[in-house]
Amino acid sequence: MTTDEGAKSSRENPAATVAEQGEDVTSKKDRGVLKIVKRVGHGEETPMIGDKVYVHYNGKLSNGKKFDSSHDRNEPFVFSIGKGQVIKAWDIGVSTMKKGEICHLLCKPEYAYGATGSLPKIPSNATLFFEVELLNFKGEDLLEDGGIIRRTKRRGEGYSNPNEGARVQIHLEGRCGGRVFDCRDVAFTVGEGEDHDIPIGIDKALEKMQREEQCILHLGPRYGFGEAGKPKFGIEPNAELIYEVTLKSFEKAKESWEMDTKEKLEQAAIVKEEGTVYFKGGKYVQAVIQYGKIVSWLEMEYGLSEKESKASESFLLAAFLNLAMCYLKLREYAKAVECCDKALGLDSANEKGLYRRGEAQLLMNEFESAKGDFEKVLEVNPQNKAARLQIVVCQKKAKEHNERDRRIYANMFKKFAEQDAKEEANKAVSKKTSEGVTNEKLTVSHAVEEEKPEGHV
């Protein structure tokens, strides 16, 4: 067969070409998924477990009959690698691709739809051919706020994850700007990583990892070392960090349902103090974790004795008030309002709860609501000078806000009026022009009539 004949054969029956020349990309090397690269991608990275990938594809049966195409829908197909969202062949084949690559995949039934098929388009025990283009891929957004992106290098064992308070043993390597600043084995309690110079993003990620999992974590400043940076490691304020973490082992902390009321109250006293230490150190996210434990343990606790109920209510009130203060510092004002609402549900005349809710609403530009809360503070404590000053601030801000709105609306109405006037002027000019043309036609018509010769048959 000549080169030209081979190229023609490849175009006419690409599935046969992959069957003859394709690379076996399966771990078992059983030729269940064969691949030929048709266009080389760029870069060195390939998708990892959990990555979200964006592809275009054409799918055909081995006889060349098309059964599906993302091009027909005019939008890429999106799925996550290694999550069982697609056939096995795709998890295997796409994970070998580079961004921009186009490849042909030939997939045996056991790596596709097997004996059941996918009727009516795909019969049982069908070998499938795909042309796949990898448009893009990105890591898993763990908290859905862009702050922690995980890329899993090695899948963990089992289905259990560390919880808050679990004792973990990990290996970590931290990088910033291409420089390794930390590399060690360390044991600590989840939620208390800061005590070991470990950023909060690692604590959060560990709660979603399995034993022996190895992953790469991209941490935004909020989940790294934040505005303070980490002089010990030479980390500047608001730096983005990359950690490679291996969870070697862990022992879960007791879940709420495993603790009796007495133990919950004892633990609440401990974590309240830990939260206060974090708060005073400016570590507000870590403080939120500690105060949040109190809420998770006691908010839905029933059947308490009078003494236990009083202690529980006291811990919950303090937790909600402290959480509100943390969220104010973190500029999460809606959450601060929510915590104040819960605190005031326990004590409707709580001065701190009213004041902090007023602060949060003021920062959300809810001036009237904020003013109402500060006025309630004065009803509780007429000597609260800060609340009195805040009322003045609310009035001033509301006035400024109203004046700004008036200016905006005045400018809008002025523009509308100018536009209407311009349209009216254009209509008038158009009408005048039209009348002029009509008069001209009449004049010409009369002139023609006067020039008509008389006496013709």
Curated annotation (Swiss-Prot):
UniProt keyword terms in alphabetical order: Acetylation, Chaperone, Cytoplasm, Isomerase, Nucleus, Phosphoprotein, Repeat, Rotamase, TPR repeat, Ubl conjugation
Disulphide linkage map: none
Gene3D superfamilies named in the record: 3.10.50.40, Tetratricopeptide repeat domain
Residue positions where N6-acetyllysine is found in the record: 28
PPIase FKBP-type domain ranges (all copies): 50-138, 165-251
Reaction equations catalysed: [protein]-peptidylproline (omega=180) = [protein]-peptidylproline (omega=0)
Annotated positions of the N-acetylmethionine modification: 1
InterPro entries, alphabetized: FKBP4/5/8-like, PPIase_dom_sf, PPIase_FKBP_dom, TPR-like_helical_dom_sf, TPR_rpt
Superkingdom as given in the UniProt entry: Eukaryota
Region of interest (Disordered), residue spans: 1-28, 424-457
PANTHER family in the cross-refs: PEPTIDYLPROLYL ISOMERASE
Annotated protein name in UniProt: Peptidyl-prolyl cis-trans isomerase FKBP5
Recorded name of the encoding gene: FKBP5
